[in-house]
Amino acid sequence: MKIYFSCSLTGGRADEKIYGVIVDDLLAQGHEVLTAHLARPEVMAEEQRISPREVYERDIQWLKEADALIAEVSTPSHGVGYEIAFVLLQGKPALCCYRAGARVSKMITGNNLPNLTVRAYGDEGEALKVVQQFLESSSQPPPGQTRSLD
């Protein structure tokens, strides 16, 4: 599956470790993570080498190519919100996962679109379980129904 992984860059990198854990697990399962570089510590230096326009055009193309979006939303980010909305409007499945206790926008937690799954996790193992359940449910999205991972 082609996955667009979304996470905070300019909003803060406090959750960088879990970004890497999620992306590494996706890659190990054989998924193509179009944005795997976002989980790496050197991403900020890499992203400074290209213009905002180039980032926008590249990322929009990746969003169009992706089968699904997985966003780690513990750290607020304008870009992540934009990417989530873009994918949802395309009707593609999206997962927004976050650290239990993190303050997440009600525009995310209150959204009941059938192609959006929002889940908190307590630790790395639970985060990976949430992602795996999402991937399993996304392989055959139920038309017109809210996804349940319980």
Predicted features along the sequence, with ranges:
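Conserved catalytic or regulatory cores that recognize and/or transform ribose-phosphate-containing ligands
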Residues: M1-D150
